[in-house]
């Protein structure tokens, strides 16, 4: 069956009829949330999935908290008006740290956020040195420092904030090669340490997409830790115990905020993840 790009006003002709399934939204500013979606889909393959990414305001790491909250609420509202949701996953560390209270106040379905996996990293480290690799926004936010104080106060935490790594992950999904030299430059503060982190928290959902390249650059034996599997387990529990009965028989669909040539180039990638169509989402505000 042909797969179509759609403008938001065209019926979804590519949808394949099936039994109604709970509808779950996975949202990110870019394509990094696909790493979280992949973990959820692995655990829960028989759901109706919607992936939405904000390619108009990407990246969120450099935006104000007020902007992010308003933007995320507007996008989730627009999706909810098209497809009643059983659950939403904000698969963006930056957006999660600031927008979850507003989302949970507005909507009656569960909203799951993504936070840096500080707690498991603190348990895994052997040398007591944990690296946090995230966006500059996540590194600076008080929420991150509260996590460290609560779960890793006996560890030495080395933080690196990088917007460039987000761009590298996006480029990789567009089929471009990842420069190991660029990664070495970004990670130079750790690579120069006499005793570098033996456990690294991937504190941005884009970064698991670069796992292969990171392992080539970081010292041998470095552990990489992210939140994807934990988010999948939390999603499964909430769907069983707290989610409303919001189902759809439609095929999985992806939404962008602007149908740019770059967004269109992502369609083959989205298809590999199980999304038949890519459509522009009309967002108010």
Swiss-Prot record:
Gene3D superfamilies: 3.40.50.1860. GO terms for molecular function: glutamate racemase activity. Substrate binds at residues 28-29, 60-61, 93-94, 205-206. The keyword Ubl conjugation does not apply. Its EC number is 5.1.1.3. Pathway: Cell wall biogenesis; peptidoglycan biosynthesis. InterPro entries: Asp/Glu/hydantoin_racemase (IPR015942), Asp/Glu_race (IPR001920), Asp/Glu_racemase_AS_1 (IPR018187), Asp/Glu_racemase_AS_2 (IPR033134), Glu_race (IPR004391). GO terms for biological process: cell wall organization; peptidoglycan biosynthetic process; regulation of cell shape. It catalyses: L-glutamate = D-glutamate. This is Glutamate racemase. It comes from Escherichia coli O139:H28 (strain E24377A / ETEC).
């Amino acid at each position: 069956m042909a797969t179509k790009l759609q403008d938001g006003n065209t019926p979804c002709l590519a949808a394949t009829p099936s039994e109604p399934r709970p509808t779950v939204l996975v949202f990110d500013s870019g394509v990094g949330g696909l790493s979280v979606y992949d973990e959820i889909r692995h655990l829960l393959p028989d759901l109706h999935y919607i992936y939405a990414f904000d390619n108009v305001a990407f990246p969120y790491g450099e935006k104000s908290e007020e902007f992010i909250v308003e933007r995320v609420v507007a996008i989730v509202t627009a999706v909810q008006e098209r497809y009643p949701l059983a659950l939403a996953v904000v698969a963006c560390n930056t957006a999660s740290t600031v927008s979850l209270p507003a989302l949970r106040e507005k909507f009656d379905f569960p909203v799951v956020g993504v936070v840096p996996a500080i707690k498991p990293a603190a348990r895994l480290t052997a040398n007591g040195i944990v690296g946090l690799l995230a966006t500059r926004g996540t590194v600076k936010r008080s929420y991150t420092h509260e996590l460290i104080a609560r779960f890793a106060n006996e560890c030495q935490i080395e933080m690196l904030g990088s917007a460039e790594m987000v761009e590298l992950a996006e480029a990789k999904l567009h089929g471009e090669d990842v420069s190991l030299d660029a990664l070495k430059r970004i990670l130079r503060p750790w690579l120069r340490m006499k005793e570098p982190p033996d456990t690294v928290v991937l504190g941005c959902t884009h970064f698991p997409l670069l796992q292969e390249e990171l392992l080539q650059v970081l010292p041998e034996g470095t552990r990489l830790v992210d939140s994807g599997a934990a988010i999948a387990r939390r999603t499964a529990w909430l769907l069983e115990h707290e989610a409303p009965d919001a189902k759809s028989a439609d095929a999985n669909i992806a939404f962008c905020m602007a149908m740019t040539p770059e967004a269109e180039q992502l369609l083959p990638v989205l298809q590999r993840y199980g999304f038949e169509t890519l459509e522009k989402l009309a967002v108010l505000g």
